Amino acid sequence: MKIGIIGAMEQEVAILKDKIEGLSTITKAGCTFYTGTLNGADVVLLQSGIGKVAAAVGTTLLIAEHNVDVVLNTGSAGGFDSSLNLGDVVISTEVRHHDADVTAFGYEMGQMAQQPAAFIADEKLITTAEQALTEMSDKHAVRGLICTGDVFVCTPERQEFIRTHFPSVIAVEMEASAIAQTCHQFNTPFVVVRAISDVADKESPMSFDEFLPLAAQSSSEMVLNMVTLLK
């Protein structure tokens, strides 16, 4: 099995990249691909860039040119579930766009035309993520809906919009729905596993930039455990 791993930013892939053996680097269309073996598994690690378009371009190349069998999306996310704290983990059961609106044509809020309303994560990969979490006894995890938009959600108004239209949302970020839609169109199994960098309606002693390295550590540990289970 060849495992594709996607992170948007350098900080989100650096820990994994440093652990790849036989590392080879390929750059194309603004995306950087790191190939080799990770914990004995054949992997392609993609640093896609931030946002949905960058993520879709990178995921397309990852699947079409690097022929990965599954896709794991790692990195940070903003928590919407009140039980979450900084460093906790979210696992996708489904992923939706929160910034798509073609409801004028009868679609659900967040549903892109001619696409399903939600992109469903692979059940086996969800189970693998949950098994991987057992090696991280200090981390709490929530599984559920992750919503994506080309928006850094930082205002009460945007938070309220998302809660109103997607009441079961557990976390938000800026790439997962594009990755999920691309995987859907290629019929490639995926799961999103991210660490919480901040939580809506909770005061944080750290800024996003300050916490990002800690979120990267948590999400990378989760991915490493998953890769070991999947190989």
From Swiss-Prot:
Gene3D superfamilies: Nucleoside phosphorylase domain. Its EC number is 3.2.2.9. GO terms for cellular component: cytosol. Keywords: Amino-acid biosynthesis, Hydrolase, Methionine biosynthesis. The keyword Amino-acid biosynthesis applies. The lineage of its organism: Bacteria, Pseudomonadati, Pseudomonadota, Gammaproteobacteria, Vibrionales. It comes from Aliivibrio fischeri. InterPro entries: MTA_SAH_Nsdase (IPR010049), Nucleoside_phosphorylase_d (IPR000845), Nucleoside_phosphorylase_sf (IPR035994). Catalyzes the irreversible cleavage of the glycosidic bond in both 5'-methylthioadenosine (MTA) and S-adenosylhomocysteine (SAH/AdoHcy) to adenine and the corresponding thioribose, 5'-methylthioribose and S-ribosylhomocysteine, respectively. Also cleaves 5'-deoxyadenosine, a toxic by-product of radical S-adenosylmethionine (SAM) enzymes, into 5-deoxyribose and adenine. Pathway: Amino-acid biosynthesis; L-methionine biosynthesis via salvage pathway; S-methyl-5-thio-alpha-D-ribose 1-phosphate from S-methyl-5'-thioadenosine (hydrolase route): step 1/2. GO terms for biological process: L-methionine salvage from methylthioadenosine; L-methionine salvage from S-adenosylmethionine; nucleoside catabolic process. It catalyses: S-adenosyl-L-homocysteine + H2O = S-(5-deoxy-D-ribos-5-yl)-L-homocysteine + adenine; S-methyl-5'-thioadenosine + H2O = 5-(methylsulfanyl)-D-ribose + adenine; 5'-deoxyadenosine + H2O = 5-deoxy-D-ribose + adenine. GO terms for molecular function: adenosylhomocysteine nucleosidase activity; methylthioadenosine nucleosidase activity. This is 5'-methylthioadenosine/S-adenosylhomocysteine nucleosidase. Substrate binds at residues 78, 153, 174-175. Belongs to the PNP/UDP phosphorylase family. MtnN subfamily. The active site is at 12 (proton acceptor), 198 (proton donor). It comes from the Bacteria.
